[in-house]
């Protein structure tokens, strides 16, 4: 369900699913600005509970704490209202509550997961795409990194894309989450696992994000651009489910896990550099993406089109004032050995990359953003 005031469709979902009890996941920031008010109002027709103390990019212990708090109480529906962290936690709860396995079991083998409770995702950013994906990310503090749990049963049952939820989103959040969404579509399109279906969604998402991210960032009142960004992010999530992200996301995980750099920002710092490294392995695909996004572009050669996309990525990061260096976050050259080792362990994503990355390659990319 998509469009202004589409949040009202939540009433129909509750009726259709014969819901008597609801568990709502959100965070204090979302509640503080009133984005959960309408959801709470609608939920008052049944029994409901709100969990609003989720941390950004939650660790295993954070998710376990929430699961333990809920205990054996049965709920008919889980609603996630927030950004990627909130939606990921909601999706994890939907497969763990009432199950005979734990989160740590899933970290070892996510294939055992089964959907226990239906879900509704209501994103309040325009970037993560978690509302459409079959995966959830948790931080592993002892490894100073992150891990994804992947199973198709985590694909949300319902999604509500209401532009009112991002109408007052700060520009810096639009920028970071928007570039994250852009990374999703570009990585999925250049992934080894790309399919015709993922290509369709990646190209459509790319068109929406490339053409609207600056508008949404620069003009707080441009709800049309923001709505297009939400839809582009959703398409990126669908593309991930059919294809998968690659080295940008793989190398960003240690940056979030150890230095707590926001996910979208860490992706943005790496994005153009990884694509430049990848170029000779995917320039045909980048050229195809360029044709889809900029059909009137005067450049003709495959190399020029690939270069144009990579430059546009770098320009968007610059134009939306996202940091471009890890130095701003206290990352030092002495940290390179850790980053190289931690990044190389993200094999779930690195196997999707169009080029194999050696330890020296990973070191080269990290050094570029120091």
Report residues per predicted region:
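Glycine-rich phosphate/pyrophosphate-binding beta-alpha loops
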Residues: 127, 234-267, 347-349
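Short, amphipathic C-terminal "tail helix"
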Residues: 333-370
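ATP/NTP phosphate-donor binding region
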Residues: 1-77, 326-327
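Glycine/threonine-rich beta-strand-loop-alpha-helix active-site module
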Residues: 61-68, 72-164
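Carboxylate- and glycine-rich phosphate/diphosphate-binding segment that chelates Mg2+/Mn2+
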Residues: 135-243, 354
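Short glycine/serine/threonine-rich phosphate/pyrophosphate-binding segments
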Residues: 7-10, 32-35, 60, 85-90, ...
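Gly/Pro-rich interdomain helix-loop hinge
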Residues: 258-335
């Amino acid at each position: 369900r998509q469009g202004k005031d589409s949040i009202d469709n939540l009433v129909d979902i509750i009726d259709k699913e014969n819901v008597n009890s609801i568990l709502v996941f959100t965070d204090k920031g979302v509640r503080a600005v009133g984005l959960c008010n309408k959801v709470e109002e609608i939920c008052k027709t049944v029994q409901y509970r709100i969990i609003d103390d989720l941390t950004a990019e939650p660790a295993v212990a954070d998710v376990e704490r929430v699961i333990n708090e809920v205990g054996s109480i049965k709920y008919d529906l889980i609603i996630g209202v927030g950004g990627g962290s909130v939606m990921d936690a909601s999706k994890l709860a939907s497969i763990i509550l009432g199950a005979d396995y734990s989160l740590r079991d899933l970290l070892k083998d996510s294939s055992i997961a089964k959907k226990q409770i239906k879900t509704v995702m209501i994103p309040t950013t325009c970037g993560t795409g978690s509302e459409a994906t079959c995966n959830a990310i948790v931080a592993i503090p002892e490894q100073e990194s992150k891990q994804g749990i992947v199973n198709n049963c985590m694909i949300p049952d319902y999604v509500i894309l209401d532009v009112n939820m991002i109408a007052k989103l700060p520009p810096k959040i639009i920028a970071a989450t928007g570039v994250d969404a852009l990374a999703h579509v570009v990585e999925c399109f250049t992934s080894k696992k790309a399919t015709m279906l993922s290509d369709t969604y990646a190209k459509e998402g790319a068109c929406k994000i490339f053409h609207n991210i600056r508008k949404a960032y620069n003009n707080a009142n441009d709800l049309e651009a923001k709505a297009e960004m939400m839809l582009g992010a959703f398409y990126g999530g669908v593309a991930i489910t059919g294809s998968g992200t690659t080295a940008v996301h793989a190398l960003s995980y240690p940056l979030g896990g150890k230095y707590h750099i926001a996910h979208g920002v860490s992706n943005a710092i790496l994005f153009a550099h990884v694509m430049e490294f990848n170029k000779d392995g995917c320039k045909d695909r980048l050229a195809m993406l360029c044709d889809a996004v900029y059909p009137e572009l005067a450049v003709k050669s495959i190399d020029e089109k690939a270069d144009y996309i990579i430059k546009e990525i770098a320009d968007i990061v610059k134009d939306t004032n996202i940091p471009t260096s890890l130095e701003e976050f206290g990352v030092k050259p002495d940290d390179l050995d850790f980053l190289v080792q931690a990044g190389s362990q993200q094999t779930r994503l690195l196997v999707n990359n169009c080029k194999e990355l050696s330890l020296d390659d990973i070191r080269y990319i990290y050094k570029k953003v120091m």
